[in-house]
Amino acid sequence: ACQLITAEDSRGTQLHRALRSTSKVSKSTSCVEAGSYCRPNVKLCCGFCSPYSKICMNFPKN
């Protein structure tokens, strides 16, 4: 799952933006949700791109 974290000061100015993701692609600003079509290394899934079905999958929850 992806979470976009933002912090604002009292004037409403954006101070910090960080993408929290379980994927190894941490510099991406957006990711494709599970169930969407993907190709490895082309569309970045929030989880991972299944090489067989070409569909974004969520990482298993532990």
Curated annotation (Swiss-Prot):
Q: Name one GO molecular function term.
A: calcium channel regulator activity
Keywords associated with the record: Calcium channel impairing toxin, Disulfide bond, Ion channel impairing toxin, Knottin, Neurotoxin, Secreted, Signal, Toxin, Voltage-gated calcium channel impairing toxin
Q: In which tissues is it expressed?
A: Expressed by the venom duct.
- Those residues forming the propeptide, per the database entry, are 8-27
Signal peptide per UniProt:
1-7
One GO cellular component this record assigns the protein to is:
extracellular region
Subcellular location as annotated: Secreted
Q: Which cysteines are joined by disulfide bonds?
A: 31-46, 38-49, 45-56
Q: What is known of its domains?
A: The presence of a 'disulfide through disulfide knot' structurally defines this protein as a knottin.
Q: Which family does it belong to?
A: Belongs to the conotoxin O1 superfamily.
- Give the function comment from the record: Omega-conotoxins act at presynaptic membranes, they bind and block voltage-gated calcium channels (Cav).
What protein name applies here? Omega-conotoxin-like Bu11
Species annotation: Conus bullatus
